[in-house]
Amino acid sequence: MSDTCSSSARPELLAPAGDWESLRAAVANGADAVYFGLSNFNARHRATNFTLAELPDVMAYLHHRNVLGYVAFNTLVFSDELTEAASFLRGIVEAGADAVIVQDLGLVRLIRRLAPGLPVHGSTQMTLTEPRGIEFVRRLGVERVILARELSLDDIRRIAARTAMPLEVFVHGALCVAYSGQCLTSEALGGRSANRGQCAQACRMPYELIVDGELRETGDRAYLLSPQDLSAHDLIDPLVKLGVRSFKIEGRLKSAQYVAVASQTYRAAIDAALAAQPFTLSRQGRLDLAQSFSRGFTQGFLGGIDHQQLVEGRFPKSRGVRIGTVVERTPHGIVVELAAEHDGADASVELIKPGDGIVFDEGHPEQDEQGGRVYRVARRTARRCELTFGDGHVNLALLALGCIVWRTDDPALRKRAEQSYGRDGSNKRQRVDFDLRGTLGGTLELIARDATGRTASACWDGPLARAEKHPLTLETAREQLGRLGGTPFELGGVRLELPAEAMAPKSVLNDLRRRAVTALSAAQEAVRSRVVHTEALDELRRECAADATAASVPGATAGLSSSEDPSPELHVLVRTMEQLHAAVEWRRTTSLRGLTYCDFEDVRRYREAVNYSHAHGQPIGLATLRILKPGEEGLLAQIAHAGADAVLIRNLAALAYFQERPAQTALIGDFPLNVANELSADLFFREGMPRLVPSYDLNWDQLAEMLKRSDAGRFEIVVHQHMPMFHMEHCVFAAMLSNGKDWRDCGRPCDRHEVALRDRTGASFPLAADTGCRNTVFNSVAQSAAEFIPRMLARGARHFRVELLRESPAETAALLDRYARVVAGLDSGRATWRQLQVINQLGVTRGTLQLS
């Protein structure tokens, strides 16, 4: 295992870099490691990023300064992209990258085969929230995992107690409202997948709250899904004590100033924790953090769930520092009453000064807001000051009294940040110890040793002479050997193993130092040099093809058909008991076989559903939650004890849980597993899954390519659904319809109200809660692949699924009738498409399968 992943190693500060300036800012301000993306296959497509051609220079820059470099390769990779991905990976290995951050499990397989020595870090896009899932990816060769941001300190403690996997935790930066790797909003609404680095940030848009069909007034809280930013510098000490290996700052799309300020802050916090010293961020430090980028700060989920605190909802963008409110207009400016948080503040810290940029917040951040540069500041009282502006910069007559004043730019901070990295240097060097050995009349050897114990040496043939006047002293040796400018090293210890009367010329010592240090640097680079198996992808593809043509995988129960049976099947997922009754009744009218899956809000009703279905002689499957946290195994136990014929697996922890049990039910992989290529599909088939649902990120051509390279008959393709867009720990029901922090005191408004979120176009997106109190926002428009079903059948697919949301029993039967005709070959799909367009008030969309 790489020393970058050792669980006993010193905790690491990991900073982001979207460009060269941010890279320098991170290094100069104390980062131990930097993560960044290349021009493709990274989850921040809009960042400047680096090219593959630049990567050797990037890694040389970092390694010369004793900093590690991790390449973010954290998107799903489609089948037709695997060849390009393999080429990128070879370049990454050859450039000396210290690790790759990966989402796609198929890509993990490829890396382990292509470059076994390259460390793989599991991206937060893997949605790892429970020890079983973490152990699953460890078995695949992942050497570190980046935990989901929705975990609390207690969750992390439980995980750390049950796995030896090194853990990485986000401690600062933007928070996604949805679980990373589980957000399909951008894909559903615009074909720009967050799993492909193209998030459209729909969570930062305004929404109206529709409760039981009526508009619910939310005041100035329009941004119902826009979380505040994470800032956990106060929690570094307990996280260090939990054994967290790496502290991660979000921000590859942010400025170098932000990277510099955040890195400084967390460097100080980590160092204080390691020294067992208390850490309190100064007032200036807090202002600097807020000024560099802030939508308001929160400890996120690290301190536990608080639905009243996570989303403030007034604005979706960085505001900077809140100065106060406008209380008076003057002939040339305004009078501001300072915000209460500045009471009793350090007078040496200037809150507002000439040259600062401000904006006036009247509660409409989506509109053009007034603002400008401050020309003069005059104190009126301890709590009030007058700000004046240049002529024409601010239309004072239009300013409303009571509006909030934010400082959006601080030139002094920008200058300080730029100075911190402007010299393009870093004090961060690695210690080197020297042993100088020799005998009179013999050779003189200098051995250099780094902090890992790696050594290199240089030798002078001598002969080593006896000093006539000035024998070599330790002081002289340290002076000559300490001349390490221009190298990544700084002098540690020096030990002399020489006769006391020996003399060595300074020129000889200098030459030995240069050669030993050069050799040590070369030895370090040699360790980073890794074997690349160029045929890895071809080998894996041959294995996948062999698996696809191997003996069929029978269903695990009598209720499931064997994969040898070519007859198409139509499955249905229901979300209410009424829909289940309708589906069971409908199955009595059709010759098509298939499973009915239950995805109920309350898993306690699963046993009732199983009994009902079995009483009517029909097989049934039960869906797990998409997320499983430590301590939630009881939810899986209820599913296991319900006696279903199949379980719809939606996370790796659930897969591992059911693999530990006797094989009583078929385990069918659902869409949250993000299967986007034949390598990941084959991985899950090898884990014993008879069927898989492909990723919703695939369009038709991409899906067809994966079907061609796999056993197409083992894919279950969802052909009708309301796309699940946001899947989030944040509960809108609790936040907006109660005063409760979490499920213990919210009063469960989700049981009493039907809620939707309405966007600026008038589209209303249904909201649902699950047993874990996690919310899913669904697309308002159903997605239909009816027209694609004949093509899928022609390519060997035979399992199709219809998912219901709020359909009535009558609508359920009618919908299943239409799709049954297409699956049975009685309709080309076009007629069904036209019928759905007519009968659905909002129509239907071809959605993700539509070619871009």
Where are these regions (language model features)?
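Surface-exposed amphipathic alpha-helical tracts and adjacent flexible/coil segments at the periphery
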Residues: 1-28, 33-43, 58-59, 65-72, ...
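Conserved phosphate-binding/catalytic loop of the ribokinase/pfkB sugar-kinase fold
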Residues: 126-130
